[in-house]
Amino acid sequence: MKIEEAIRYFERELEKIEEAEAIEASAAEPDEELLHAWSYEREATGMALTALRVIHARLVCLGIDG
């Protein structure tokens, strides 16, 4: 898998996580443990996405096709 593909994958996953988190938060009685879990998942996915973007930028600077 190329880095660009991995970035797109994690972008889609982050959108899904944010949507699920928003749906749970808007529930009549949101499950706080589930919201906490979604928060961790969102943060971890965001960190992975940031790392991939940094790696991609470095490869581009080096003239390497990621």
Regions found by a protein language model. Name each.
Residues M1-K2:
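Absolute protein N-terminus
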Residues R8-R12, E19-D65:
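Short, charge-rich amphipathic interface segments used for partner binding and complex assembly
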